[in-house]
A protein has these predicted regions:
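Long, internal low-complexity/basic segments
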Residues: 69-72, 81-90, 230, 294, ...
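Localized edge beta-strand/strand-to-loop motifs within extracellular or lumenal beta-rich domains
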Residues: 468-489, 552-554
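Flexible glycan-contacting loops in extracellular carbohydrate-active proteins
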Residues: 503-543
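Short, aromatic/His-centered strand-loop micro-motif at the edge of beta-sheets
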Residues: 454-473
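C-terminal, low-complexity/hydrophilic appendages and adjacent surface loops
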Residues: 184-203, 279-335, 341, 439-440, ...
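Glycan-recognition/cleft segments
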Residues: 421-449
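Active-site regions of oxyanion-processing enzymes, predominantly non-cytosolic
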Residues: 1-73, 100, 104, 109, ...
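Substrate-binding rim/cap in mid-to-C-terminal beta-strand-loop elements of soluble/periplasmic
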Residues: 113, 148, 152-269, 317-320, ...
């Protein structure tokens, strides 16, 4: 912003600032963790937190006095039912989350302070949105030090998570909190992220500031609006018309509704001008229309990675009905009492879904996320690489999950030995690596190692000898125990046709390697797969010569 004002001080600026907080992983700075932990905000647990939040919402006028707190779900544990070990861990999870939120708020404050330092605060419209969906329950029932365990259907027991307790929130973890915290964070509503049928999965607080233009400073507005209303609000506020074409491409109409009318105190209780809105995700769906909401009851729980066949996406869902003008928390389901109203809104949902290309509906989860898509690697069983290669996404890498495979590397070792990565996929939170290591002190000629990292829960190693100068063929051959997700197997490491190590794994990664890692040949561009033994620092370039690396994939 400062540079823009220095280069072209007469021009207005637009800033879209979107920090990662508080999407998992929760990674605040240690200073913020210390500050929030010292405040003991979460020590009384999620049920008490929910009551406190709801009381504050009523005190501040965010929720009307007649609003009712929705019931706690039976699928999530009550705080008082937990043991001391569980409570201690869950408090730590929430403290790190709270620190991440406070850290982000502080940085947002710095941005606003910079606007004020430029002398432009009174001339700047600020729209602050407190999130992009409901709080996430994807940490499963116990939370996790590594969210990729969730994506692979692994629920890490509380006692095992204590290994990461001192490091929670640091680069040693990829953490998320327990699902019950998510439900509490969505107070007073039901449900969480992934469930757009209910306000717990969609409702966000919004604050707007524009001195001299918004007269009712500190005023509360309860009109229904949607994120698609942000652009129309900006266009009306600035007097700019939406472009009909961009780079020669005709633009679709803006479907949202400006919120500018709500700035007038006379319109504080006026009916919303955004009268109808559909919601849909993973088969969960709802329709808002003039103060009424019809919504499906979720068929699955977002804190469970279900492999079961989902119900029929049309006929397999129960519907609920709410008058949210009178019942803003969606407490009182009127579906049984008002079937005609429900039917009217159901028909409206399908009309809107047709209009806005929502159909066909799809309520699959794991299969939808992990569906093979058109790619250069689909259907291939052999891959050959020569020389250094980096940053290849998993979708374009050899797919070694849930099958037998062979990795063969032809390398040349110089005089004095070599070290470095030959080939790797994944990293600290799950993956594998074939590399040469001179150990912690960098001595020797370089020992050949294959390391498999099972989601940072267990590492299995195959260790061979130091390689003499000259040409060598290194082979790692893995035979899977059978079909199915995450099955184990036996791996054999060979050098120049001679077996040098054999080991077994009871389990392998079933669904996905970490999405923020990559497949690399000749170096490791992201985090390392090792932790203590054979630890290395990226990029860990191979100091010998790679002639060829070949993958052969089985069934």
């Amino acid at each position: 912003m400062k540079q823009l004002k220095e280069i072209a001080p007469e021009k207005p600026f637009f800033v879209y600032y979107v920090p990662g907080a508080t999407h998992a992983p929760h990674h605040p700075t240690p200073e913020w963790i210390k500050k929030i932990s010292a405040m003991h905000l979460f020590d009384e647990g999620w049920n008490k937190l929910r009551e406190t939040i709801f009381a504050n919402q009523k005190r501040l006028g965010i929720m009307p006095d007649n609003a009712r707190l929705t019931p706690w779900p039976k699928e999530l544990p009550e705080w008082d039912s937990l043991g001391l070990e569980e409570k201690k861990l869950f408090i730590r999870q929430a403290d790190v989350y709270g620190a991440y939120l406070a850290y982000a708020d502080n940085e947002i404050g710095r941005v606003i302070q910079a606007v004020e330092d430029l002398g432009e605060l009174d001339n700047t419209l600020i729209i602050y949105i407190g999130g992009d969906d409901g709080a996430s329950a994807e940490g499963m029932l116990n939370g996790t030090p590594n969210e990729f365990t969730t994506f692979n259907g692994v629920d890490v027991p509380v006692k095992d998570q204590y290994l990461w307790y001192p490091f929670w929130g640091s680069e040693r973890t990829f953490p998320h909190y327990a699902a019950a915290w998510a439900w509490a964070m969505d107070t007073p509503f039901k449900w969480v992220k992934q469930v757009p049928s209910h306000f717990g999965g969609t409702s966000q607080g919004v604050a707007m500031s524009w001195p001299g233009h918004i007269g009712d400073v500190g005023g509360i507005r309860r009109q229904f609006h949607h994120v698609i209303d942000i652009v129309p609000t900006l266009l009306e506020a600035t007097g700019i018309s939406a472009p009909e074409t961009v780079n020669g491409i005709e633009q679709r109409p803006i479907e949202g509704t400006s919120m500018l009318y709500t700035w007038d105190k006379a319109n504080a209780t006026a009916p919303t001008r955004h009268t109808t809105q559909y919601f849909e995700m993973l088969g969960n769906r709802a329709i808002y229309d003039n103060g009424w909401v019809a919504a499906t009851t979720p068929a699955t729980r977002p804190w469970e990675l279900s492999t079961a066949t989902p119900p029929d996406v049309i006929s397999g869902y129960k519907w609920e009905l709410y008058n949210v003008d009178e019942d803003p928390t969606q407490f009182n389901d009127l579906a049984a009492a008002m079937p005609d109203k429900l039917k009217q809104l159901q028909d409206l949902f399908y009309a809107e879904a047709t209009k806005y290309d929502v159909l066909p509906l799809d309520n699959s989860t794991l299969s939808r996320w992990n569906t093979p898509r058109p790619s250069l690697t689909a259907g291939r069983t052999e891959f050959t690489y020569s020389g250094e290669l980096s940053g290849v996404p998993a979708s374009a890498a050899p797919g070694t999950l849930n099958k037998s495979y062979t990795i063969s590397a032809d390398v040349e070792i110089p005089a004095g030995g070599a070290e470095g990565m030959i080939v790797t996929e994944g990293g600290r939170f799950g993956g594998y690596g074939l590399f040469l290591s001179k150990g912690e002190f960098g001595v020797g000629r370089g020992k050949i190692v294959f390391l498999y990292n099972l989601l940072d829960l267990k590492r299995t190693m195959w260790e061979g000898p130091e390689l003499e100068p000259g040409k060598h063929t290194i082979v790692f051959d893995f035979k899977s125990d059978g079909k199915g997700l995450g099955t184990g197997g036996t791996g054999v490491l060979s050098v120049d046709g001679k077996e040098v190590a054999s080991n077994t794994m009871d389990h392998t990664i079933p669904v996905t390697f970490p999405e923020d890692e990559s497949f690399d040949v000749g170096l490791d561009t992201r985090t390392g797969v090792s932790l203590v033994e054979y630890r290395y620092d990226s990029p860990f370039k191979f100091t010998g010569t790679i002639d060829r690396v070949t993958f052969r994939l089985g069934q």
